[in-house]
């Protein structure tokens, strides 16, 4: 999947993956992670998610990474914020208050960029990527984040043969294969969310589960 795919989706406002509210799983499960106030939180492939502002509102410093500049600009405009813009290595960094959005390729992130990230939040990153890129994404995430990092991972699980992604199906077995060697994993919630999801219903899916995992990186 090429960068141009996502650039075009944002240019055409084909962003059905964007939620117009804070993710309910974030609201329910984040407080139980006991992430310290002031901790920096990495949010890969963040789009213009309202979750970014919510995390900042909890007293966290937020580091979002997003390929599409339009998504980054839209976030600050919709939040009524005027960001400072600076260049940092391969990234154009937009900063306002407690939120920094790094516009560029996630795979260009280095360990020193995220050395103080004590937490991770992935709602729409892993499931946005095809299989070969998911393996690379998980490996890169593991390589750059510090030990004792904790966070939430939210996936979709359905029969991939019935529908092309994105969003892609990511099974529990795949999550275990990507993360179990370096992270402690705990399934916090599994919900059947097929009802009302017209995009999936029209593909005649029989089941569609959202799954929430807690991740704790081993030191």
UniProtKB/Swiss-Prot annotation:
EC primary class: transferase
Pfam families documented for this protein: TPMT (PF05724)
Record-level GO cellular component terms: cytoplasm
Name the record gives this protein: Thiopurine S-methyltransferase
Keyword terms of this UniProt record: Cytoplasm, Methyltransferase, S-adenosyl-L-methionine, Transferase
Subcellular location, record wording: Cytoplasm
Organism per entry: Ectopseudomonas mendocina (strain ymp)
Catalyzed reaction equations: S-adenosyl-L-methionine + a thiopurine = S-adenosyl-L-homocysteine + a thiopurine S-methylether
InterPro entries per UniProt: SAM-dependent_MTases_sf, Thiopur_S-MeTfrase_Se/Te_detox, Thiopurine_S-MeTrfase, TPMT
Gene: tpm
Keyword Methyltransferase on entry: yes
Known EC number: 2.1.1.67
One of the GO BP terms on file: methylation
Top-level lineage group: Bacteria
Gene Ontology MF: a single term: thiopurine S-methyltransferase activity
Chain ranges passing through the membrane: none
Ligand binding (S-adenosyl-L-methionine): 10, 45, 66, 123
């Amino acid at each position: 999947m090429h960068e141009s795919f996502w650039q075009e989706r944002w240019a055409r406002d084909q962003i059905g993956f964007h939620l117009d509210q804070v993710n309910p799983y974030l609201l329910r499960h984040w407080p139980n992670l006991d992430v310290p106030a002031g901790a920096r939180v990495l949010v890969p492939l963040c789009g213009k998610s309202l979750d970014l502002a919510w995390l900042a509102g909890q007293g966290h410093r937020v580091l979002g990474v997003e390929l599409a500049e339009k998504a980054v600009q839209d976030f600050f405009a919709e939040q009524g914020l005027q960001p400072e813009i600076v260049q940092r290595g391969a990234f154009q960094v937009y900063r306002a208050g407690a939120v920094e959005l790094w516009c560029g390729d996630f795979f260009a992130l280095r360990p020193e960029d995220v050395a103080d990230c004590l937490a991770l939040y992935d709602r729409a990153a892993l499931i946005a990527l095809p299989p070969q890129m998911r393996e690379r994404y998980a490996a890169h995430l593991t390589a750059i984040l510090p030990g004792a990092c904790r966070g939430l991972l939210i996936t979709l699980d359905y029969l991939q043969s019935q529908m092309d992604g994105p969003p892609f199906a990511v099974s529990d077995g795949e999550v275990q294969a990507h993360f179990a060697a370096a992270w402690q994993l705990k399934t916090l919630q599994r919900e059947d969310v097929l009802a009302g999801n017209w995009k999936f219903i029209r593909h005649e899916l029989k089941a569609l589960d959202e799954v929430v995992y807690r991740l704790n990186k081993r030191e």
